[in-house]
């Protein structure tokens, strides 16, 4: 699979949109372990950076972008423009919080402009 370009802007320098393929998305859902949640709760009492949560959210975003690229490639696109993130948290039961991140944008076929 060729690399899919993903940008947050709607235009790419030295390229033109040959065809708009359509909307694409990629979603990832993760949770911390019960021990991780407990340790995070203890750290929250004293304040400061929540490194475990930061790492989890960043990994979730990376997975969402990978899924976005796979979706775009499956439709024959070579780029995604206007990429954005949406995220949320929900309770999976028994106090287990799940972090959800969706990356979305518009799949296009870009051609180089000489």
UniProtKB/Swiss-Prot annotation:
It holds the Pfam family YbjQ_1. Gene3D superfamilies: Hypothetical protein apc22750. Chain B. It comes from the Bacteria. Belongs to the UPF0145 family. This is UPF0145 protein Acry_1752.
């Amino acid at each position: 699979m060729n690399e899919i370009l993903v940008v947050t802007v709607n235009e790419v320098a030295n390229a033109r949109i040959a065809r708009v393929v359509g909307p694409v998305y990629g979603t990832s859902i993760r949770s911390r372990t019960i021990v991780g949640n407990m340790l995070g709760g203890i750290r929250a009492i004293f304040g400061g950076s929540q490194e475990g949560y930061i790492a989890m959210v960043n990994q979730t975003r990376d997975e969402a972008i990978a899924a976005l690229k796979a979706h775009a490639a499956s439709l024959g696109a070579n780029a995604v423009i206007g990429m954005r993130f949406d995220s949320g948290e929900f309770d999976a039961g028994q106090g287990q919080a799940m972090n959800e991140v969706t990356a979305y944008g518009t799949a296009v076929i870009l051609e180089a402009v000489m």
